[in-house]
């Protein structure tokens, strides 16, 4: 954070006539920088905290898009022939294979907002279930990188990336194919897209196809660490606070909430599994087991799916009025 402040203190780049750059200094103050000298300088220059960024931001050198409104942010991540899907090292991120398989974590809870307050905590995190991603749910010894050192796996398909509409809304599109590597499923493929409009995101998947008969293929809606086992999930209008919880639902239309105020509508799914439970997973550096309580929901495509797909919408922190309307009717149309 302080880097914003140091750059701002070098001088004004905007032509404002101030002794420090107001945009960089405003970003530093918004992010609550802690350098006392910088804070004093910016106050003397009459600079206050800048506005929170809002819009859809494209980062195709990372095959990524960031969708922001208010105090929440969603990072959409893919990979392609030029952008690797994750950075795995000897003692870092050993189970991070799925980070770019169409992931879409929502960061928007806490005061201040943080990843931890938004439910993203490593202790007990199931590395197979990255929100938004379509993955094969593997045992951890098989999910761990097959190489003892660095692995930066690329996607053999070039068509993956993000685009924006007038900087306000946008899309992520991804076609991925798994490489032929130890403990991978060669040729496993999926076509995925995410359309972002204000606080709505529409997730579409098709051509989900692989020959892995041993383990199920899944698309994760959410995985969130719970501060209390009594945190509630709403499923088709019914509240569930029991712990542990294990539900399976399907049908033409399924409406559910997560534990952070976000709302999901899943269309024509054979099976959506919803759990609240204690989970144990290995640390990404040491492999030591760690435990935590998590609420999770995922679409189960079964083993060795052939041309499977999905359609679901996510409404980020909707009002009660919005929820009432969405339960009855979609706010979008798939052409």
Name the predicted role of every residue range.
Residues 2-335:
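Extended polysaccharide-engagement surfaces of secreted carbohydrate-active enzymes
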């Amino acid at each position: 954070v302080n880097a914003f402040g140091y750059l701002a203190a070098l001088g004004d780049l905007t032509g404002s006539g101030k002794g420090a750059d107001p945009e960089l200094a405003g970003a530093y103050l918004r992010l609550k920088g802690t350098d006392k000298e910088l804070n004093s300088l910016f106050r003397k220059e009459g600079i206050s905290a800048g506005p929170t960024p809002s819009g859809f931001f494209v980062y195709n050198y990372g095959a990524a898009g960031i969708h922001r409104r208010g105090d929440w942010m969603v990072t959409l991540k893919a990979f392609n022939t030029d952008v690797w899907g994750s950075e795995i090292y000897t003692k870092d991120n050993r189970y991070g294979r799925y980070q770019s398989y169409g992931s879409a974590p929502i960061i928007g809870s806490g005061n201040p907002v943080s990843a931890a307050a938004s439910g993203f905590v490593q202790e007990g995190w199931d590395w197979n279930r990255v929100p938004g991603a379509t993955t094969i749910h593997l045992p951890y010894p098989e999910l761990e990188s097959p190489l003892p050192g660095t692995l930066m796996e690329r996607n053999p398909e070039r068509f993956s990336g993000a685009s924006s509409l007038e900087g306000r809304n946008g899309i992520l599109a991804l076609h991925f194919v798994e490489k032929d590597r130890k403990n991978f499923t060669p040729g496993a493929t999926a076509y995925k897209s995410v359309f972002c409009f204000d606080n709505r995101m529409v997730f579409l998947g098709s051509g989900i196809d692989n020959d892995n008969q041993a383990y199920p293929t899944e698309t994760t809606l959410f995985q969130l660490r719970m501060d209390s086992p009594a945190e509630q999930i709403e499923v088709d209008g019914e509240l569930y606070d029991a712990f542990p919880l294990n539900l399976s639902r399907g049908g033409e239309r399924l409406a559910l909430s997560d534990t952070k105020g976000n709302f999901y509508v899943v269309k024509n799914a054979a099976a959506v599994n919803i759990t609240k439970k204690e989970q144990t997973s290995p640390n990404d550096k040491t492999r030591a087991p760690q435990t935590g309580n998590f609420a999770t929901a995922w679409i189960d495509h079964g083993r060795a799916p052939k041309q499977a797909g999905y359609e679901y919408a996510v409404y980020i922190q909707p009002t009660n009025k919005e929820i009432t309307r969405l339960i009855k009717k979609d706010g979008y149309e798939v052409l």
